[in-house]
Amino acid sequence: MAPQASALSQTLESLTLSKIRELEKQRSSYEERKARILADAENHTDLYSRVQTILTGTKTILPNATRDVVVLNIERWLEQHCFDPSVTHEMLQEYETELRSRLDAHSRKLSLADLYSRLLTEWTNADGEEEGDVSEEDYMVVDERQKQRLQQLCDQFEQVVFSPLQTDSGEIHEFFDSFFPDDDKVEALNSLRSDIKSSSLEIFEEEAPFDHSTLTATIKGLLTEDILSEAKQEVLKDFLKNKVALTEIADVLNMRWADLEEWDWFAGEDGIPVLPRQQLNGKYRIWMDEDVLQLIFVQYIGTRLCNLLKMTLKDFIDSRKVWNWDAAPPMTEEDKARYSYYIGSAPVGYGPEATRRSDYIDEYFLSQLPLSLTTLADGGAPYDDDDDSEGDEEANGGWGPADAPVPAAHRQIKQRLLRKIATETLVQRVIYGEAAVVQSDLRWYATGLPHSTIFAVMSYIGFSEKWIGFFRKYLASPLNMDKSSEGRTPVGPQVRQRGVPMAHSSEKFIGELILFFMDLAVNRTTGLLLYRLHDDLWLCGEPEKCAQAWEGMNSFAKVTGLEFNLSKTGSVYLSDAVNPMIESRLPKGPVTFGFLALDPSGAWVIDQDQVDAHVKQLKNQLDKCDSVMAWIRTWNSCIGRFFKNTFGQPAMCFGQRHVDMILAAYKAMQDSLFGNGAGTVTQHLRKMIEARFGVSDIPDALFYYPEELGGLGLRNPAISPFLVRNSLEPSPLKYIADFQQKEMDQYLQLKKNFSELTQAAKTNRYTRFMSDEENRYISRHDRDTFMPFEEWSRFRWSHSSLFFKLYAKLQDVPDAKGIQTTNEVSNALRQVLPNINSLDDEERWIVHMYAPEVLKNYGGVSLVDKKYLPVGVMAMVKEKRVKWQMVL
């Protein structure tokens, strides 16, 4: 830990201990005074005097008693009793019981506050010990097998990056030329090249681009990438706080920029250290440990080129000269003429095709690239394959980044894509008869990219030789792996021959630049959209087109020197009459999103084998937690987020059956972790607390209540699915059946309208919509026969508003149906929360579920008063995210 952080930790620890000691003093004092009050009360033989004694003591020792309406009312009624016999003996007994319950409730609150503080102390002490065991530049291996896997990772990395793979630039250019077969497309390509060249040269020739603003954006962007050691993160954070430092850094980097053509690594005799470092998600990846100023410099360059590429290519594909946006064959002039005659108006584009196009451009196309210099700093553009098990420069066992610093909107991009693929597959299968889905990714993509391919593509798209020359030097980095793993024979720095640095902006720029041409290849040859999140790839549509697209992707990979990861490649062919020729051209293997798999029936099901393996891994992780709070955080990180994401977000395209599968999976997981039907998570935690602290009388609410109300915030995974379960149909086929019925009703109504036209009206319509050239489209016989249903419905994608509604509906997520709020609980919440709407639906469910017990035993809805808790240390330790260890 950095010295400043350590000093802060020690200060907070000292303050925490002081607060805990003060709490213990208050608790002891309260219990002593309470005991004296009750003892004094027992000395009184008459009931009135006893109640009066307890009342006086309550007002003395109970915080806020003088403002407690119930206490004040009892005081008034006791005065009334002296003069009015209507205040009966039984009523006095009730007053006594009420006052005693208030005293006992405060005792329980102080006891829970004491327990809470001890739990926090245990957590912070354990956390400090962990930090002391591992230096900032080291990595942990938990057993010999893990050490071997890490060694294997380093060996594979070394084998790939220092072994050149030469590709043929002429062959690449010729392959790309085939995407531009006519003059219009060549003109568009030349315009693209001109824009890229001029805009990139403007960046290259800028004067003094570094100032406080650009440095702040670049540094903040770096801090979101999880590529820096803790020490270097602290250095960058210190830069952001120091304007003098920013000014000096800007001066140095502007001098480097002025001599950009002569830039080099200048890494010295030892080169750039390369180390495997464990990320928050538990994966080990191979990182270059470059100089901080050099890192800022190249990060800025990469980000600016990302911005340029994204804006330019989005404009490029928006043109129909270049890109095929038709989800189905478009209307011909004959189709339009016939439609106009039979319907009585020209066709209007109300179908989902336009939305599908805008979704692709705005959400999925080049989604890895930041759109501006501040995008990364603002939390935009990052994507990581949450359940990746074999990828670039990494080794893991399948755990995803449950606490990785990725904004919610961008964590959800894969969920939105899942719904998109599920919807289009469902529609294609049910309405059009058959569908196929293809999934793949590229093996060691960023690590193994041939440099010759990079330069060929940069040249083809219009980057000047100045930029290509810069990247020749940048990619040929002198990497030193001598300290990457134990027992390595020192060989000194070696020049990188393949690949780009992981997670840098340059990787985004180069990686997306290369794969843009795969997007283009698929679209130009088949009209399909390649849904791609970096190098994770999905196709869906007609089986023949999917097979053709897969062949085109393989041709692209061959010419560019890329390789598909066969362990993550597969397809599903859904049809009542599978064509063996088409099937043989599709890749073998399953199609999965997280733990959801597309089965041969077309349903998305939870892969229980994967779940079981991860539950076993979770149990190992939980068993290694050395504090109760760490156990809860690990549980929340996995159960509350990781599994929630990998099971897929409930949606209309999955139906209620999917929610029931999620609930069944959670139940099976808890049975596996805590014993089949014999234990629960709260029983397990009670046993932990009793064994460590000797406390057993703990309400369930303490575990599940949110921290704002004095709880530990334990996640109950069943609540989130229950919030939406009743907002879904049992099967998504119900939505399609409803659409088909409405579509047929609409067709029959239009047919009826046409049949009721007089002959004169038909003649008038024919004259109105048919030119001399178009009159051949409708024969004399057809003038009196309404168009067939197949012809009328052929253009759903472009012209059906009903189909648009179905397409949007299937991708919707259901509205949460929260628990009904009672006045009693709402009033209690208002007494302790400045805004009761700050609780989300899940928290409200929990609060109401346990409110009767809490209100009865704790005198309100809050379990522990915040003033008794060491909130500073809570905030500090919560900043440290859960890091998975059992992952190799």
Residue ranges and their predicted role:
Residues A476-G487, G570-R585:
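Short, conserved secondary-structure transition motifs
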Residues M1-E353, L733, F739-L888:
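Non-catalytic, polymerase-adjacent accessory regions of viral genome-replication enzymes
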Residues L275-L295, R488-I510:
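Short, conserved non-catalytic motifs in the polymerase core
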Residues L562, N579-L888:
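Active-site and adjacent loop segments of nucleotide-processing enzymes
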Residues F509-G552, F556:
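Active-site palm subdomain of RNA-directed nucleic acid polymerases
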Residues A267-Q278, T425-V430, R472-Q494:
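Active-site-adjacent bridging/hinge elements
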Residues H451-I454, S459, W538-K558, I606, ...:
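Catalytic palm subdomain of template-directed nucleic-acid polymerases
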Residues E290-D291, L295-S440, W444, D841, ...:
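Active-site-proximal segment of RNA-dependent polymerases
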